[in-house]
UniProtKB/Swiss-Prot annotation:
Catalytic activity as recorded in UniProt: [protein]-L-isoaspartate + S-adenosyl-L-methionine = [protein]-L-isoaspartate alpha-methyl ester + S-adenosyl-L-homocysteine
The organism of origin for this protein: Methanococcus aeolicus (strain ATCC BAA-1280 / DSM 17508 / OCM 812 / Nankai-3)
EC numbers, comma separated: 2.1.1.77
Name of the featured protein: Protein-L-isoaspartate O-methyltransferase
Family: Belongs to the methyltransferase superfamily. L-isoaspartyl/D-aspartyl protein methyltransferase family.
Alphabetized PANTHER family for the sequence: PROTEIN-L-ISOASPARTATE O-METHYLTRANSFERASE, PROTEIN-L-ISOASPARTATE(D-ASPARTATE) O-METHYLTRANSFERASE
Alphabetical list of InterPro entries matching this protein: PCMT, SAM-dependent_MTases_sf
Pfam families documented for this protein: PCMT
Underlying gene: pcm
Keyword terms: Cytoplasm, Methyltransferase, S-adenosyl-L-methionine, Transferase
A GO CC term attached to the entry: cytoplasm
Single GO BP term: methylation
Xref: CDD domains: AdoMet_MTases
The protein's role, per its UniProt record: Catalyzes the methyl esterification of L-isoaspartyl residues in peptides and proteins that result from spontaneous decomposition of normal L-aspartyl and L-asparaginyl residues. It plays a role in the repair and/or degradation of damaged proteins.
Locations listed in the record: Cytoplasm
Length: 216
């Protein structure tokens, strides 16, 4: 792992105000991003950009992983649901933050990606991550409720099925929209649903029963 490159990225994110949680900073410096991308892209592992992982999917840019983790206000011991495993990198970062007393449930619709991510996470010792191959727009009621939920693909709206699986006082972060997307922070607070727009983003489409029905 090119630690100096990641240190420079993390320092830049802190200076730009994107990264306030020291636990997120530590996790970014710990997880070897190069392990989650194709070998031919290893030279770009510690460049703050999305990278192609096959099947029309990408590993998110480092700053986007940081922004989502920061917005979720992750705590040690949290149970977290991720929709869109992709490479497994984001799940590994979250797993570092929530620790061995926490748990990450991550759902991936593409079998090949789910299998590869599970293999990589297992190799790196992330025993607190469970990979499920299935329709992420439905969530996973088996392990609900969750302290935090986040999506790595953008749907027409935040699926009610996921909001229902969020604990009272929980937080959910999701990109919403198709060609024009916004990153939305949703909180269940005092019996109300509160939403905040965190800014414009660009994610792959959320495919499934409660998402888009086709690739765009």
């Amino acid at each position: 792992m090119t630690i100096k490159k990641m240190e420079a990225i993390v320092k830049g994110l802190i200076n730009a105000g994107y990264l306030k949680n020291k636990m997120v900073s530590k996790a970014l410096l710990t997880v070897p991003r190069h392990e989650f991308i194709p070998a031919e892209l290893h030279d770009y592992a510690y460049v703050d950009t999305p990278l192609n992982i096959g099947h029309g999917q990408t590993i998110s840019a480092i700053h986007m992983v940081a922004i989502i983790c920061d917005a979720l206000d992750l705590k040690e011991g949290d149970k977290v649901l991720e929709i869109g495993t992709g490479s497994g990198y984001h799940a590994a970062v979250v797993a570092e933050i929530v620790g061995k007393n926490g748990q990450v449930i991550t759902i991936e619709r593409i079998p090949e990606l789910a299998e590869k991510a599970e293999s990589t996470l297992k190799k790196l010792g992330y025993t607190n991550v469970k990979v499920i191959c299935g329709n992420g727009t439905l969530g996973s009621s088996e392990f609900a409720p969750y302290d935090k939920i986040y999506l790595t693909a953008s749907g027409p709206d935040i699926p009610n099925s996921l909001i229902e699986q969020l604990k009272k006082g929980g937080k959910l972060v999701a990109p919403v929209g198709l060609y024009i997307q916004d990153l939305i922070l949703l909180e269940k607070k005092n019996g109300n649903i509160i939403k905040k727009n965190l800014g414009a983003v660009a994610f792959v489409p959320l495919i499934g029963k409660n998402g888009w029905h086709n690739e765009y």
